[in-house]
Amino acid sequence: MTATAQQLEYLKNSIKSIQDYPKPGILFRDVTSLLEDPKAYALSIDLLVERYKNAGITKVVGTEARGFLFGAPVALGLGVGFVPVRKPGKLPRETISENYDLEYGTDQLEIHVDAIKPGDKVLVVDDLLATGGTIEATVKLIRRLGGEVADAAFIINLFDLGGEQRLEKQGITSYSLVPFPGH
């Protein structure tokens, strides 16, 4: 099933836009409204599974927290394992970490050291691509463990915030179902 314009429009219309959230001047794209619509949620998963079913993916990595909501069902659909990337102190086994920059300060992500094996072909899944900082840190973690990042997939791409270009500089291609301008 290749995504049709009608299907993609349905997904786009299922995502509510909230003006001035979380602060004035921001137009927030609320992916949780897509999750509330079982047809839209299933369609988003089905389209990603269809796109990657013959790509030789061996692991799907999802970033905390909404990346779990899309990454885990995509992993099930592909018949591969799901690996969570989390904020510090949330994973019980030995981890490695990677810092990344935020608008005001830094944050950190962690992954279990035994979750990715050398040679694993990894699909990174998250709900939204904005500046790309979270995904760039996730890619670095995967590569440090010997994994190959095959692609990064998103439900939403805020295309004018530079995330795609940032990932391209890391040699990562990306795919998104719904483009929106970023605000």
Curated annotation (Swiss-Prot):
Gene3D superfamilies per the UniProt record, alphabetical: 3.40.50.2020
NCBIfam families xrefs: apt (TIGR01090), PRK02304.1-1 (NF002632), PRK02304.1-2 (NF002633), PRK02304.1-3 (NF002634), PRK02304.1-5 (NF002636)
EC number per UniProt: 2.4.2.7
EC category name: transferase
PROSITE patterns: PUR_PYR_PR_TRANSFER
SUPFAM superfamilies attached to this UniProt entry: PRTase-like (SSF53271)
Pathway involvement of the protein, from the record: Purine metabolism; AMP biosynthesis via salvage pathway; AMP from adenine: step 1/1
Protein's UniProt name: Adenine phosphoribosyltransferase
HAMAP family: Aden_phosphoribosyltr
InterPro entries, per the entry: Ade_phspho_trans, Adenine_PRTase, PRibTrfase_dom, PRTase-like
The organism's place on the tree of life at top rank: Bacteria
Role summary: Catalyzes a salvage reaction resulting in the formation of AMP, that is energically less costly than de novo synthesis.
GO MF annotations in UniProt: adenine phosphoribosyltransferase activity
The reaction(s) this protein catalyses: AMP + diphosphate = 5-phospho-alpha-D-ribose 1-diphosphate + adenine
Compartments reported by the entry: Cytoplasm
Family, as annotated: Belongs to the purine/pyrimidine phosphoribosyltransferase family.
Subunit text: Homodimer.
UniProtKB keywords: Cytoplasm, Glycosyltransferase, Purine salvage, Transferase
GO biological process: adenine salvage; AMP salvage; purine ribonucleoside salvage
Cellular compartments per GO CC: cytosol
